[in-house]
Design a protein with these regions (language model features):
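C-terminal and inter-domain tail/linker signature
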Residues: 1-138
Length: 138
C-alpha cells in the first residue's frame, strides 16, 4: 500500500470513529471541504455549517447512532467503505415521531479525496430497510 493510501485509510477510520464518538469537530477536520451527499434522500450538505446541521438532525433522531466497519477498499481517488449503521429512534425525524425502535442497515460510502483530505462523502443505502424496522408493527 502506498503512503497516500495509508494516510487516506487512516483519515477515513478517524472520520468514522469520531462520528461514533460524536466528536464532530474532529469529523469536520478530516475534510478538505465538508460535503455529504445522501443519495437515497437526495440531500446534499455542503460546507461546515450544513454538515454540522446534518449531524445535529441525525443524532437528535438517533442519539446512539453508530457505524461498524465491514470492509474497506481503495481506488485512485477514493476509499470505498461498506459498513453497518445502527441506532435507536429516540427523537423526531422529518415529521416522524420517535418509535423507540432500533435499526441496522448495511450501507456503502464513497469517500472522495483531494490529496489526503476528504472532499465528499457519498452515501448509498436502502431507505426501506430502515423504515421497515422503525415502523414494524404500525
Amino acid at each position: 500500500m502506498t503512503a497516500l493510501r495509508e494516510r487516506r485509510e487512516a483519515v477515513v477510520r478517524e472520520h468514522m470513529e469520531s462520528e461514533n464518538e460524536h466528536d464532530f469537530d474532529t469529523t469536520l477536520a478530516t475534510f478538505g471541504h465538508p460535503r455529504y451527499e445522501i443519495i437515497p434522500t437526495g440531500d446534499v450538505h455542503d460546507g461546515p455549517e450544513a454538515v454540522m446541521a446534518y449531524f445535529t438532525e441525525s443524532r437528535t433522531a438517533f442519539p446512539d447512532q453508530r457505524n461498524e466497519l465491514v470492509s474497506l477498499r481503495h481506488s485512485d481517488d477514493a476509499v470505498i467503505v461498506e459498513f453497518d449503521l445502527k441506532g435507536t429512534h429516540r427523537g423526531p425525524l422529518r415529521g416522524f415521531e420517535p418509535t423507540g425502535r432500533e435499526f441496522t442497515c448495511r450501507m456503502l460510502a464513497i469517500f472522495e479525496f483531494a490529496g489526503d483530505r476528504i472532499v465528499c462523502e457519498r452515501v448509498y443505502f436502502d431507505r426501506a430497510t430502515i423504515l421497515e424496522q422503525l415502523m414494524a408493527g404500525d
